[in-house]
From Swiss-Prot:
Protein name: Endothelin-1
tRNA processing recorded as keyword: no
Functional description taken from the UniProt entry: Endothelins are endothelium-derived vasoconstrictor peptides. Probable ligand for G-protein coupled receptors EDNRA and EDNRB which activates PTK2B, BCAR1, BCAR3 and, GTPases RAP1 and RHOA cascade in glomerular mesangial cells. Also binds the DEAR/FBXW7-AS1 receptor. Promotes mesenteric arterial wall remodeling via activation of ROCK signaling and subsequent colocalization of NFATC3 with F-actin filaments. NFATC3 then translocates to the nucleus where it subsequently promotes the transcription of the smooth muscle hypertrophy and differentiation marker ACTA2.
InterPro entries per the UniProt record, alphabetical: Endothelin, Endothelin_toxin_CS, Endothln-like_toxin
Signal sequence region: 1-25
GO CC annotation terms, alphabetical: cytoplasm; extracellular space
Region feature (Endothelin-like): 110-124
SMART domains attached to this UniProt entry: END
GO molecular function term, any single one: cytokine activity
Gene this protein is translated from: EDN1
UniProt keywords, alphabetically: Cleavage on pair of basic residues, Disulfide bond, Secreted, Signal, Vasoactive, Vasoconstrictor
Cystine pairs: C53-C67, C55-C63
Family designation: Belongs to the endothelin/sarafotoxin family.
Originating organism: Canis lupus familiaris
Amino acid sequence: MDYFPMIFSLLFVAFQGAPEAAVLGAELSTGPDSRGEKPAPSAPWRPRRSKRCSCSSLMDKECVYFCHLDIIWVNTPEHIVPYGLGSPSRSKRSLKDLFITKATDHRKRCQCASQKDKKCWTFCQAGKELREQDSMEKGWNGHKKGKDCSELGEKSKQQQLVAGRKIRRLDAISNSIKTAFRVAKLKAELYRENKVTHNRTH
């Protein structure tokens, strides 16, 4: 009898299924009754992204740069682009944590992950104090302007109108300068692209 082809095919099938069988055997051997060891996790391990704190606004670029430690910041012609913000692994939050964060001051620049991180706390508090100082200065300047207007009457209103016109004129000039620069930049890019395609054809 010729058993060689049958044995060879069985060995071939057995060795192809060997890695899965080994994994199944390992999972079966590490059951709850085997020395109290925990079974291996089935999902692949993903490294958690290190985050020093969470910003109240992602528009605050300085805060995002400070809080997200492993983001690679790339200079592009228009602005600085953060890579690595997409789909970070999130831990589940309880309702208690949600109420605590809502109860905290919403004007804070950011919220630190560790309470022992003193640099983070000073950074977040400094941002809050700066915003409060700015708002106080704006209020004080508005109060002084109101005082001047009440004393001078019609002259003050006229001065405010003239100042408003000057500001609008300056804004219009700055906008026209910006558009001129954008147009020049676009023309330079088009020229570069045409030059590159011209070089490739010859």
